[in-house]
Curated annotation (Swiss-Prot):
Signal peptide (from-to): 1-19
GO cellular component terms attached to this protein's record: extracellular region; membrane
The organism's place on the tree of life at top rank: Eukaryota
Topological relation to the membrane, as annotated: Single-pass type I membrane protein
PANTHER family listed in its UniProt record: PROTEIN PSIB-RELATED-RELATED, PROTEIN PSIH-RELATED
Protein name in the entry: Protein psiI
InterPro entries: Fibro_Slime, PA14/GLEYA, PA14_dom, Prespore-cell_inducing_factor
Species assigned in the record: Dictyostelium discoideum
């Protein structure tokens, strides 16, 4: 009775506030994917017996695949031989899907299956435990749904002995976590992307303990926790995990698998086949949200088969009947409406043409074409070309090009001179002394009298005015018998070099090189051995390169065309951006959070992920961290809340004493009444009927039998 009286006094002094309490979880789920393996498809499984082998994998995890990477792919290194990596190249399929590989020898085919490992709280230590010395989680699953594959036993009973388990999670470091493991075969654990447990190879059960306080982690910061386990050999399979790490899954794929890639519920061959041999069918990206009313098949991706370019004269496209890239000759455009005639295709330049509107075809051609007709030089064009003298008449001769004749032609009377003044013809009568000197003229001459030294008028014939056409690029000729005047184009300029009607020299004429291809320069240049001989270069044009954010290509019809540079990302967390001077650079991907209690981070394997913020409590063994979102007046915050009921490790010793009682918080007078009047049975009845499960308290210290022989008055109910 004295003990009960003391308890009454102590309980009356306790002020217990239950509104800020929470219940400690009794289970911890580690969610991942297990990959069923079969030795015929991967001879790294069921090789000859091996031993524990460290340094098989690199110290840093592959952050893109979130899987380990072998230190070497050479099969005959000491570590690979000891670790029984018979075919190291197949290690990539230990923890990554290869479901559609052919079912042939060493193809690496595997079968992914979602897997959850449930750890149970040990309230006396505050750790979560999974202990299974008979660990065969996928018997009759994966490949083994087919009896053909059930041919491995432990001597008597069938089991699926060949599988690899991958668990990718995160946790918020609280400051005192531990992780213990015992099992076989390969086991690798990465924390903060660094290897902390290295138990590779085929071996008997082996263990390793990790105290996270030795890893240099920062309290209240999120870290990655990645666990990899393989069973590669008969006849045992054991595993024991004990940890206080509160691991959680920050991302689920559309199959509902933690850190999944969609492979457990989407098979591109089954779910995404569109029947088109010229598309590459793939499952939706792992972070795809499947809207209500839609199926996975509705969101599959179908990328066109890309066929490599051969040359400018060949189209290499996918044949819809065979699914193979098939080269065919390109069909060049009909450009007759542009007065262009097709030439043989050039592999480096593509379709080439010759213009029928060059001066070689007709010296009166301007080089322009309208509706399939070459445009010729007009009289005004020739006038401008030859000097535009108002006292001359200009026109274009199909044999000679631009020519001119006097506006005011001389008549038969040599004493009547037809004079032109600013385009106006007038007849001027000459004195017979200067115009009648007995000239005997041929058909190409005109009368001209000059005064001899003796003062007499003598004949000095001149060429007819119309013989000179004013074009220095023609050779003018008159037949003295018939008077026929001709103007022949000079032959000193050859090729694309044409005579300049102003200077009479040979000048390059680019129009003569027009090939109908906007990707060639169509430039006339002088030959190395003869400056009067022009040669067309027709070199491929160089498109601008000044703006590094534009990529130029040449279209044979349009010329240089540009499109924005698409800068590639580096992984999922480095975004490619373009600077017009520097070109492509990388910047970190920004993941925006919409609330204080939602964390948005970039995960290299996935991209932006959003998950609930985990708060680190002041005392992780006895408290839970609770996140409180911001309000209009208060910022978001984390707070620590006591577990209710208190875990046993947060209570005092089992024997009742004043010090013990003073440190134990009991939930109100109801508990006290139950304890006093009903003893242990009354307390148990109260505990079993509470709204919040008393899951984490296996014992009441007030009701523990004394280990030193002393009597605990509350251990038994009054008789």
């Amino acid at each position: 009775m004295k003990i009960i009286f003391n308890l009454l006094i102590l309980f009356s002094l306790v002020n217990f506030i239950n509104s800020q309490s929470t219940t400690q979880a009794t289970t911890l789920k580690l969610e991942g994917t297990i990959y069923d393996q079969y030795p015929y498809y991967d001879n790294n499984f069921e090789p000859i017996a091996g031993s524990l082998t460290t340094r098989l994998v690199q110290n840093a995890i592959n952050t893109t695949t979130r899987t380990p990477t072998l230190n070497t792919l050479l099969p005959f290194t000491t570590t690979n031989v000891m670790g029984r990596m018979v075919t190291p190249s197949l290690f990539q399929y230990f923890y990554q899907p290869n479901k559609n590989a052919p079912l042939t020898n060493n193809s690496g085919a595997n079968f992914p299956i979602p897997m959850t490992v449930n750890l149970t709280l040990n309230p006396s230590t505050g750790t979560y435990v999974y202990d299974n010395q008979f660990f065969f989680p996928i018997d009759y699953q994966g490949f083994d749904t087919n009896p053909f594959y059930r041919n491995y036993t432990d001597g008597t009973d069938y089991h699926n002995f060949h599988f690899c388990l991958k668990i990718n999670t995160r946790f918020t470091y609280t400051g005192n976590e531990v992780f213990y493991f015992v099992g076989d075969d390969d086991v690798w654990v990465f924390i903060n992307d660094q290897l902390v447990i290295d138990l590779g190879g085929l071996h008997e059960a082996a263990g390793k303990n990790i105290d996270l306080t030795t890893l240099g982690l920062t309290k209240n910061k999120d870290y990655t926790f990645d666990f990899f386990y393989c069973e590669r050999h008969t006849t045992k399979s054991t595993i024991r995990i004990e940890t206080s790490i509160q691991a959680y899954c920050p991302f689920y794929d559309y199959c509902g698998v933690c850190y999944g890639d969609g492979s457990t519920c989407c098979d591109p061959v089954v779910n995404c086949n569109d029947g088109d041999l010229c598309t590459i069918d793939s499952c939706p990206p792992r972070d795809t949200i499947i809207p209500a009313g839609f199926s996975i098949s509705d969101l599959c991706q179908h990328a066109p088969v890309s066929c490599p370019s051969i040359d400018m004269c060949t189209n290499n496209t996918c044949d819809s009947k065979s699914g193979q890239c098939t080269p065919t000759s390109i069909k060049c455009d009909d450009k007759s409406s542009q007065c262009l005639t097709l030439k043989p295709c050039d592999p480096s330049s593509g379709c080439l043409y010759t213009s029928s509107c060059t001066s070689a075809h007709n010296p009166c051609n301007t080089g322009a074409c309208s509706n399939g007709q070459c445009q010729t030089k007009s009289n005004s064009t020739c006038a401008a070309e030859l000097g535009n003298d108002p006292c001359k008449v200009y026109y274009c001769d199909i044999n000679s090009g631009c020519v001119s004749q006097p506006l005011c032609k001389q008549g038969p009377d040599s004493c009547e001179q037809n004079v032109c003044n600013a385009g106006v013809c007038t007849i001027k009568k000459l004195d017979p002394s200067v115009c009648s000197c007995g000239c005997v003229l041929n058909k190409c001459q005109k009368n001209n009298c000059v005064t001899a030294s003796n003062g007499t008028s003598v004949c000095s014939p001149l060429p007819l005015d119309e013989i000179d056409d004013g074009n220095p690029c023609t050779d003018d000729h008159c037949d003295e018998t018939t008077g026929l005047i001709t103007h022949n184009i000079t032959t000193k300029c050859t090729g694309c070099m044409k005579c300049n009607t102003t200077t009479g020299s040979c000048s390059p004429t680019n129009n003569e090189c027009q090939d109908g291809n906007e990707c060639t320069d169509n430039i006339c240049v002088a030959a190395a051995t003869n400056i009067n001989q022009g040669e067309c270069s027709n070199k491929t044009v160089s498109c601008p390169t000044t703006d590094k954010c534009l990529v130029y290509t040449c279209d044979t019809n349009k010329g240089c065309v540009s499109k924005p540079v698409v800068c590639p990302n580096s992984g999922n967390c480095q975004v490619g951006v373009c600077d017009s001077v520097k070109g492509c650079t990388l910047v970190p991907r920004v993941c925006n959070s919409t609330a204080f209690c939602l964390v948005s981070q970039c995960d290299e394997a996935i991209g932006c992920i959003t998950f609930e913020k985990r708060c680190s409590p002041d005392n992780s063994k006895c408290q839970s961290g609770v996140c409180v979102n911001a309000t209009a007046t208060e910022p978001g915050k984390c707070k620590s809340v006591d577990y209710d009921p208190k875990p046993f490790i947060c209570q005092t010793g089992a024997i009742v004493s004043t010090a013990v009682v003073a440190s134990v918080v009991v939930v109100g007078a109801v508990v006290l009444g139950a304890a006093i009047f009903a003893g242990k049975k009354g307390y148990d009845h109260w505990k079993a009927n509470q709204g919040q499960v008393f899951a984490s308290s296996n014992a009441n210290p007030l009701y523990q039998q004394s280990n030193n022989g002393g009597e605990n008055a509350l251990f038994e109910a009054p008789q």
